[in-house]
Amino acid sequence: MERLVGKPAPEFEMKAVKGDGRGFTEVKLGDYKGKWLVMFFYPLDFTFVCPTEITGFSKRAEEFRDLKAELLAVSCDSQYSHETWINQDIKQGGLGKINFPIASDKTTEVSTKYGIQIEEEGISLRGLFIIDPEGIVRYSVVHDLNVGRSVDETLRVLKAFQTGGMCALDWHEGDDNL
């Protein structure tokens, strides 16, 4: 896998369902110019770990926006699958309304560019990328299919980057930079 951290983020343009499940939009990297972007890939809709991550990030979306960061979820499912999942009753395995779009990487082009595509399965690993306002990848983490990511850690890392300084082990907001 080619290193992305410190390099311009690979361009993308994808169809997405709006977080409220009411309509579609196009999302592209250029839409986020001037803002931080936390883009996270997940394997499939209607699964077990994925909704815990998506709803976890959604519940804290305002904290990301307060940091001038936008959230974007991506999977290889179609935008229609995303729409159905958002609009399906939670008690029946639905996701419910969320606070950011979910994009469709149906062609797997984007997950391949970001180095997280599992070709033989047609899905992506759990990759998360923090892209700065100039479009540079500042952080990436990739998890196996079975382990979800941490919203707290993502916020901590985002805040650390926004200090503009060097942050030591276990740095937290309010700590001094090196």
Curated annotation (Swiss-Prot):
GO terms for molecular function: thioredoxin peroxidase activity. This is Putative peroxiredoxin in rubredoxin operon. InterPro entries: AhpC/TSA, Peroxiredoxin, Peroxiredoxin_AhpC-typ, Thioredoxin-like_sf, Thioredoxin_domain. Residues 3-163 form the Thioredoxin domain. It comes from Clostridium pasteurianum. PROSITE patterns: THIOREDOXIN_2. Belongs to the peroxiredoxin family. AhpC/Prx1 subfamily. The active site is a conserved redox-active cysteine residue, the peroxidatic cysteine (C(P)), which makes the nucleophilic attack on the peroxide substrate. The peroxide oxidizes the C(P)-SH to cysteine sulfenic acid (C(P)-SOH), which then reacts with another cysteine residue, the resolving cysteine (C(R)), to form a disulfide bridge. The disulfide is subsequently reduced by an appropriate electron donor to complete the catalytic cycle. In this typical 2-Cys peroxiredoxin, C(R) is provided by the other dimeric subunit to form an intersubunit disulfide. It is found in: Cytoplasm. The keyword Oxidoreductase applies. Thiol-specific peroxidase that catalyzes the reduction of hydrogen peroxide and organic hydroperoxides to water and alcohols, respectively. Plays a role in cell protection against oxidative stress by detoxifying peroxides.
